[in-house]
């Protein structure tokens, strides 16, 4: 039998589909999410409803976002979930989560087994809506979770680490082996909880400036910041900010990146924006 077929559905590579089928793992994830009636629960990529069913059983209403037309149609006719579901058959990357939270009347609790081929850009999309999100629980490639939680001075630490930790508290929940899926992915997976900060620990004046600095620094991560960010900061300014110009991108903390971003926001008129 084709191991890409699960419950009569052929997993589609272009959608990054791997279907969760390990009941212990499913129960552990649902327990971590702890869905409650009355909450604005939103699932991204419900697939064959491995998480949708146990979460939906606890709720009166559940919103799901599913790109695959066939899977969305299956959910509409689901024997007991159908009436509870609000289904958006679209790419989550095009979803306005702010408008959705407004429509639902409260911050969203977002969860899902994210397609690994779009997980990083989707995370950045969601970060732009953290004002509208209470928390997020995602199954991701373990390597991505390692990057989300990484601190300075580690190989896994990068732009995703800085931006995720700027917006959220990042908490690893559990690791999941390939055998928990059909078809088994070639990588280990992990579940992570992201809780947007109620008060930003290191507020920045302009998020686009923080984004620019981290992009430029980590695109040249082997260079010292004297060189990688030399077009934005002089050695004197870095020293004044208490940042060693001989450090590399991976040595700089989230707080220091935010400090640099705020200095640059205040001094952008003298530099190109």
UniProtKB/Swiss-Prot annotation:
Provide the family line. Belongs to the class I-like SAM-binding methyltransferase superfamily. rRNA adenine N(6)-methyltransferase family. RsmA subfamily.
Q: What is its main location?
A: cytoplasm
Its EC number is 2.1.1.182
Q: What GO molecular functions are on record for this protein?
A: 16S rRNA (adenine(1518)-N(6)/adenine(1519)-N(6))-dimethyltransferase activity; RNA binding
Alphabetized InterPro entries for the sequence: KsgA/Erm, rRNA_Ade_diMease-like_C, rRNA_Ade_Mease_Trfase_CS, rRNA_Ade_methylase_Trfase_N, rRNA_adenine_dimethylase, SAM-dependent_MTases_sf
Protein name in UniProt: Ribosomal RNA small subunit methyltransferase A
Q: Which GO terms of the cellular component aspect does the record hold?
A: cytosol
Q: What gene is this protein a product of?
A: rsmA
> Which function does this protein serve?
Specifically dimethylates two adjacent adenosines (A1518 and A1519) in the loop of a conserved hairpin near the 3'-end of 16S rRNA in the 30S particle. May play a critical role in biogenesis of 30S subunits.
Any Pfam family matching the protein: RrnaAD
Query: Which NCBIfam families does this chain map to?
Result: ksgA (TIGR00755)
Please give the catalytic activity noted in the UniProt record.
adenosine(1518)/adenosine(1519) in 16S rRNA + 4 S-adenosyl-L-methionine = N(6)-dimethyladenosine(1518)/N(6)-dimethyladenosine(1519) in 16S rRNA + 4 S-adenosyl-L-homocysteine + 4 H(+)
């Amino acid at each position: 039998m084709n191991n890409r077929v699960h419950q009569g559905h052929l997993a589609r590579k272009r959608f990054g589909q791997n279907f969760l089928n390990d009941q212990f793992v499913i129960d552990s994830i649902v327990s971590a999410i702890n869905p409650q009636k009355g909450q604005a629960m939103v699932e991204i990529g419900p697939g064959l409803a491995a998480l949708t069913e146990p979460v939906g059983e606890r709720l009166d209403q559940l919103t799901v976002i599913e790109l695959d037309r066939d899977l969305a149609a299956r959910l509409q006719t689901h024997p007991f979930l159908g009436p509870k579901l609000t289904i958006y058959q679209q790419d989550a990357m095009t979803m306005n989560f702010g408008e959705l939270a407004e429509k639902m009347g409260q911050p969203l609790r977002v969860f899902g087994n994210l397609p690994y081929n779009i997980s990083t850009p989707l995370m950045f999309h969601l970060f732009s809506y953290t004002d509208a999100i209470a928390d997020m629980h995602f199954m991701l490639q373990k390597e991505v979770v390692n990057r989300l939680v990484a601190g300075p001075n580690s190989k896994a630490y990068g732009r995703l680490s800085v931006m995720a930790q700027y917006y959220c508290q990042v908490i690893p929940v559990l690791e999941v082996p390939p055998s928990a899926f059909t078809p088994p992915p070639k990588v280990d997976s992990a579940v992570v909880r992201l809780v947007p900060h109620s008060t930003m620990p290191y507020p920045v004046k302009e998020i686009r400036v923080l984004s620019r600095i981290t992009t430029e620094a980590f695109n040249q991560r082997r260079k010292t910041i004297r060189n990688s960010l030399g077009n934005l900061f002089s050695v004197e300014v870095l020293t004044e900010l208490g940042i060693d110009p001989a450090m590399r991108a991976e040595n700089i903390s989230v707080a220091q990146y935010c400090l640099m971003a705020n200095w640059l926001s205040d001094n952008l008129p003298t530099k190109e924006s």
